[in-house]
Swiss-Prot record:
This is Ribonuclease PH. SUPFAM superfamilies: Ribonuclease PH domain 2-like (SSF55666), Ribosomal protein S5 domain 2-like (SSF54211). It is an enzyme of class 2 (transferase). Homohexameric ring arranged as a trimer of dimers. Its EC number is 2.7.7.56. It comes from Actinobacillus pleuropneumoniae serotype 5b (strain L20). GO terms for biological process: rRNA catabolic process; rRNA processing; tRNA processing.
Length: 238
């Protein structure tokens, strides 16, 4: 039996709280069970140097974990003086996922940065961050429209992500930490509303997985992400 007596294909309870902080143009607290991530979207009227004069905008992301978001305290990366490889990989993944659903030309020459800070980690922090960041980004874009800066929302749709894996020989959806740390195969899947995939990250930690198992995991992810997309639409009243 899975933790919390979940079925193999069952997603943890998902909660998306909008307008969580005061100052950011878009602010969301997203909760996947006991995993909690704060996602704040900031709009700046500038673009990176490589986009100067290109008549388009940019969407980027940063990711971090609070020192006591895990079972034992981690040292802040700022105290170490550099970001770790895992952090850089995750924030690039978040940014790529968000750009997949934004018309950068329609955004104009401005940058939206989404800061994703893990308050509490119990597996799936990057997938929760992507799912929450999308809602925060949507709110930031909607504010640009409401303020008369843009005529239309540049977002082309929604994007969400979930973890799947093989634990004790079973394909499971939305892994908690205890499952993730014991998984034979661990995979993160990012998908947009029409079912197309943005990214698939899959690794066999123990035995290699078969082609059939890959298809089974992708099917589980598709089911789970559709539930997350429904939660996003409900939160945004779309």
């Amino acid at each position: 039996m899975r933790p919390n007596n979940r079925e193999l294909n069952q997603v943890r309870p998902v909660k998306i709280t909008r307008h969580y902080t005061r100052y950011a143009e878009g602010s969301v607290l997203v909760e996947f069970g006991e995993t909690k991530v704060l996602c704040n979207a900031t709009v700046e009227e500038t673009v990176p140097r490589f986009l100067k004069g290109q008549q388009q905008g940019w969407v980027t992301a940063e990711y971090g974990m609070l020192p006591r978001s895990t079972h034992s305290r981690m040292q802040r990366e700022a105290a170490k003086g550099k970001q770790g490889g895992r952090t850089m990989e995750i924030q690039r993944l978040i940014a790529r996922s968000l750009r997949a659903v934004v018309d950068l030309k329609a955004l104009g020459e401005r940058t939206v940065t989404v800061d994703c800070d893990v308050i509490q980690a119990d597996g799936g922090t990057r997938t929760a961050a992507i799912t929450g960041a999308c809602v925060a980004l949507h709110d930031a874009m909607s504010k640009l429209v409401a303020d008369g800066v843009l005529k239309e929302n540049p977002m082309k749709g929604l994007v969400a992500a979930i973890s799947v894996g093989i634990v004790d020989g079973n394909a499971v959806c939305d892994l908690e930490y205890v499952e993730d740390s014991n998984a034979e195969t661990d995979m993160n899947v990012v998908m947009v509303e029409d079912g197309r995939l943005v990214e698939v990250q899959g690794t066999a930690e123990g035995e290699p997985f078969s082609h059939m198992e890959l298809l089974q995991l992708l099917d589980l992810a598709h089911q789970g992400i559709n539930q997350l997309l429904d939660a996003q639409r409900k939160a945004l009243a779309l």
